[in-house]
Amino acid sequence: MNIPFNSVSKIQWRNPSPVSDTSCLVCGDPHGKRHYGAMSCNGCKGFFRRSIWEKRTYKCSFNNECIIEFKYRNRCRACRLKRCLHVGMDANAVRSERTRKIKTEIDGDVKLEIKEEPADSEDADDECPLDIKPDIAMAWQTKEIIAHMLYEEDRVLNWEEPYNKLRYYTMDSEVLQAIKDPSQVCARTKINWNSHSRPLITIEALRFNWCRTFTLTIDWFETLPEYRALIDDDKELLVKFSLMPVGWLWYAYKSYEYRCDGIVFVDGSWFPRDKTIQQQVCPTCVLYYGRITESFMADVVNSMKELEMDETEMVLLKAICHLQPDYRLTRRGNDVISTGREKYKRALCEYIRMKSNGFMDASFRLCKLMQILPVVDILGKYEDESALLVSLGETEFNGSGGGLPYDIHASDSHFARKNRRKSDNQYHQQHVPLHIQ
């Protein structure tokens, strides 16, 4: 008994033979004619001719083993050209045809007459639907990156440790020490984004949420190999650059996920978008979040709703948002950060291509997602201004000697000396107005 496909080669299996003698040997289109020495359709003829004339080079992302068939022949041009040559299309015939055409046009004695092809013009490369999937599957490297990031996201969000309820968070810490051991700033208490009671935020909740978000975000930074590879000085700068934007991206996704019309916090409290409800919130919290909330909802949360953003896109965006090159970093630090940023951008591009219905759809979605990043960066700057106002004028926000928010949010803190905060506290205690340059 003959077993079906027993003698079929790998290339024949991935590129099935045409169903009739008049089919295109490249893609299987039933309307084939002999072009350049092989049976081919007008689309493949035009593709082959342009590729040879213009000396185009293509690159395959899947080891030169893509399926070439009529409906999906545009997926990989490298494999399509390889298939054209494999079935016997002659590149020399294309070159000689072009030579004859140029000579005829120069002489001007003979008018070149080109017969129009019905419907399927050779210059109209492909009639394939535009809504096809552009890629069969993601590369295994991308799958591993995404799987690792989703695992770490879940681990960090569910990381709980025993703590002393009498003193489990403080703002009195040096930045570098807080980065090295974020549990000094806040114990790893249970994260509760979706509280059933959903209380309005208070000044005490504001202080706690600032500290718990700091610990949560630093814990997440530590999951990225690029961050772990940096020296301490680069880590400190990178935290100051990206702590707020990454936090706002996280908050926005949780507000979108739990359909909260305002900012949702890690302890389950919230700050409302509705200004009528804001009247029930303490003035310090309104000063802190009032300016931020409208842009937060309109420009970030609503964009996530329109796109129906998923968690994979969110974690990849967080990594891109975090890894921002800057002239103040060391050269090695910038190299590490730039390489990592490109890695996560490629992973995001490939993931979006996989889940989209075509290149146009994928490009549009990628643009809309990337437009979120400058918005959360602006939200971070808004919070810098709000936090400075509150931390300098509200002892109930700072607590006793709480200078970490000031060091993180101050615009000139990247260049501050180690004793800068001590001097600022002395001025503040003497009630001398402090102006941020």
From Swiss-Prot:
One of its GO terms (biological process) is regulation of transcription by RNA polymerase II. The keyword Disulfide bond does not apply. Keywords: DNA-binding, Metal-binding, Nucleus, Receptor, Transcription, Transcription regulation, Zinc, Zinc-finger. A zinc finger (NR C4-type) spans 24-44, 60-79. The keyword Metal-binding applies. Its main location: nucleus. Residues 21-96 bind DNA. Residues 141-409 form the NR LBD domain. This is Nuclear hormone receptor family member nhr-100. GO terms for cellular component: nucleus. Belongs to the nuclear hormone receptor family. InterPro entries: C.elegans_NHRs (IPR052499), HNF4-like_DBD (IPR049636), NHR-like_dom_sf (IPR035500), Nucl_hrmn_rcpt_lig-bd (IPR000536), Nuclear_hrmn_rcpt (IPR001723), Znf_hrmn_rcpt (IPR001628), Znf_NHR/GATA (IPR013088). One of its GO terms (molecular function) is nuclear receptor activity. It comes from the Eukaryota. Orphan nuclear receptor. It is found in: Nucleus. Pfam families: Hormone_recep, zf-C4.
